[in-house]
A protein has these predicted regions:
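Surface-exposed, glycine-biased beta-strand/turn segments
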Residues: 17-90, 97-102, 116-118, 123-126, ...
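Sec-dependent N-terminal signal peptides
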Residues: 2-14
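A solvent-exposed, charged loop/short amphipathic helix patch at secondary-structure junctions
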Residues: 107-118
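Histidine-centered catalytic micro-motifs
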Residues: 147-154
Length: 161
């Protein structure tokens, strides 16, 4: 099982970071859960990056693109950003403490408009473009988690991890 996880992790990094992507968080480069790890009734679809039990580390746009979707929920991924990259892939950042001030204002307005905390809002390419290296949010422990960390995924154009 350990060899399988190591192999999957190597494949993930070879594919994901062969594209000159930046590391997604200004915390550690220590991975606490790998892609494909068995979970009750499913497999882990990304990697979890250690944030030393703390919230508030800067999350970085790994490449140029735009924020295509933002979600908030008290379950699952909690506060989440979907960053559509110019290469067609989508980077997913989950369990955020908060977004950038501009996105926080949008999310607060959506919460008020819909009268509920759970939202799933899609944005257009010109709504919120980002440049590689921009700060897009801050790490946290929202949703169904047991402690602060960044859950990070790269999905292909079909939405598959």
């Amino acid at each position: 099982m350990i060899i399988k996880n190591i192999f999957i992790l190597i494949l993930f990094f070879c594919y994901s970071f062969s594209q000159d992507y930046l590391w997604p968080v200004q915390a550690s480069k220590e991975i606490t859960a790998v892609f494909g790890e068995e979970r009750p009734g499913r497999y882990h679809t990304g990697i979890d990056v250690r944030t030393f039990g703390e919230i508030g580390y800067k999350l970085i746009a790994i490449d140029d693109g735009y924020i295509s979707r933002i979600r908030t929920s008290s379950k699952g991924y909690g506060k989440t950003i979907y960053l559509k990259l110019n290469d067609g892939n989508t980077a997913v950042y989950a369990h955020l403490d908060h977004f950038t001030p501009e996105l926080d204002n949008l999310v607060n307005a959506l919460h008020q408009h819909y009268g509920k905390y759970t939202i799933d809002h899609k944005l257009e390419p010109n709504d919120h473009p980002v440049t590689k290296g921009d700060i897009i949010g801050y790490s946290g422990d929202t949703g169904g988690v047991s402690g602060p960390h960044l859950h990070f995924e790269i999905r292909n154009a079909d939405g598959q991890p």
